[in-house]
Amino acid sequence: LPPVADRIPQQPLTVDLAALGREPGQHGGEIDILMARGKDTRLMTVYGYARLIGYNPNMALQPDILGSVENKENKAFTLHLRAGHRWSDGHPFTSADFRYFWEDMALNEMLSPFGPPEKLVVNGKPARVEILDELTVRYSWDEPNPYFLPALAGARPLYIYAPAHYLKQFHASYQDQAKLNEEVEFAGVRNWAGLHTRYGHQYKFDNPDLPTLQPWINTTHPPSERFVFERNPYFHRVDTNGLQLPYIDRVLVNIGSAGLIPAKAGAGESDLQARYLRLDNYPFLVEGGERNGFNVHLWKRGVGSQMALYPNLNSVNPAWRALVRDIRFRRALSLAIDREEINQVVYFGLV
């Protein structure tokens, strides 16, 4: 590999760990996590959380992959890329990747039969996409699109770029038809669009050959009982000491039975686990932590409540239908629910 200085952007994103209440680390080591299905590789896209623009711990949006963003009244967004940023295979990440997504994917009837992603459409009108230079792209609409930036920051983000240098080999506009036909037959898909979709799905994270901007790279072809993710040598973040992130060399995703994951986690077979754990697992996980030297944390969730009741407003019984449609009844029902007792009995007094 080239020296680190040649593998990171000219102005990388510097992460101040001390400001986050953490300490700088060192390179090395690996993390074991447990998953139940091969397609759970997509969760590495969630956990890695490299986004064009992302949420910080205070839930404020800030540039991440992007160097900066100009927002004009939620109608025009000018995105500035980081000079020198590269895909995980070392190829430059530029506005050409945004052009490819828009012109060759979003506007292609074979790849996007229903048109561009809905977050790029406002009142039936798609975005105007301007490639201003190698590092600058602008998206604009006649009316405000307040959902654009949050969509880019989502757990399953809105992708508006794709690795053009890799995906063109599967696109009818760039590849010889005879070669495409061979690839289609080998992959067992219906046409070149199916081929392009299979090998180009960034969120699924199941194609080791697909270049990525995430902190770790999938190195394992499915199906497998273990997926190995290795550190991206071209990742765009560094710590305040100049060490390239992430610190961890490898993440090992071990596939097993969903019902056994809480027990395995309690036995210390996972270094970091949230998926497939429930609140009723909490007592024995705490006990397992005391035996095996790990900590169990509770975190706030973005949902309104752990459970919800939905009275049937369309009951066939006219008397019952009239009752539940009366707002006074629904308010009384809400007041009658003993939330504290439910908390103590069902949730161990933790919510």
Segments and roles (model prediction):
Residues 1, 7-10, 115, 161, ...:
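Selective for proline/serine-rich intrinsically disordered segments
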Residues 10-35, 77-87, 92, 166-179:
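N-terminal short leaders/motifs
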Residues 54-57, 68-78, 82-117, 122-130, ...:
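Extracytoplasmic/periplasmic ligand-capture domains
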Residues 117-196:
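Surface-exposed binding/hinge segments that line
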